[in-house]
Amino acid sequence: MHTKINPKKVEMFNSLKEFLDGKDNIFFLDYRGLTVAKLTELRNKVENEKGELKVVKNNIMKRVLKDRHMEGLDSYLLGPTAVVTAVDEANVIAKIFYEFVKTSTLKVKGGFVLGEVYDEAKLNAYSQLPTKKEAISLFMSVLKAPMSKLARTLKALSDVKVES
């Protein structure tokens, strides 16, 4: 006996597979209680940072993850699930939904960041990291400080020599 696979489910599977193609950072959110307007607001904020948000069917998502050899994520696929993906600067995307959590019923379930499973606590810590731009700025200020100090010292030295 051969079971016929629902073409709509095959289409959803392929769509989700395409959605995850080339994405190393995947977050799972529980959107229970969010209005359509709030979910749309979150989606827009995520898209402004080059991320994507999609509401998924858990069983199909489990199959896609299995197909991609991504293990240990089934526990995040319970209840209403929205999946957020990010190509780079994943912590920027994580900051967005953690800010959103403060003012809504949104809950963070967990994620998959650069090949590693992150639980909610680890994702929260990850969201606190500086962005790439902030890290570069911080690094540049650290490099610049000794040079600024040297310049001020030389200026003070030249001022002293001019006075004498």
Swiss-Prot record:
GO-annotated cellular components: large ribosomal subunit
Gene Ontology terms describing biological process: translation
Keywords noted in UniProt: Ribonucleoprotein, Ribosomal protein, RNA-binding, rRNA-binding
GO molecular function: large ribosomal subunit rRNA binding; structural constituent of ribosome
InterPro entries: Ribosomal_uL10, Ribosomal_uL10-like_sf, Ribosomal_uL10_bac, Ribosomal_uL10_bac_type, Ribosomal_uL10_CS_bac
Taxonomy, superkingdom: Bacteria
Coiled coil location: none
NCBIfam families associated with the record: PRK00099.1-1
Subunit structure: Part of the ribosomal stalk of the 50S ribosomal subunit. The N-terminus interacts with L11 and the large rRNA to form the base of the stalk. The C-terminus forms an elongated spine to which L12 dimers bind in a sequential fashion forming a multimeric L10(L12)X complex.
Function description: Forms part of the ribosomal stalk, playing a central role in the interaction of the ribosome with GTP-bound translation factors.
Family statement: Belongs to the universal ribosomal protein uL10 family.
PANTHER family membership: 39S RIBOSOMAL PROTEIN L10, MITOCHONDRIAL
Name of the featured protein: Large ribosomal subunit protein uL10
Lineage: Bacteria, Pseudomonadati, Spirochaetota, Spirochaetia, Spirochaetales
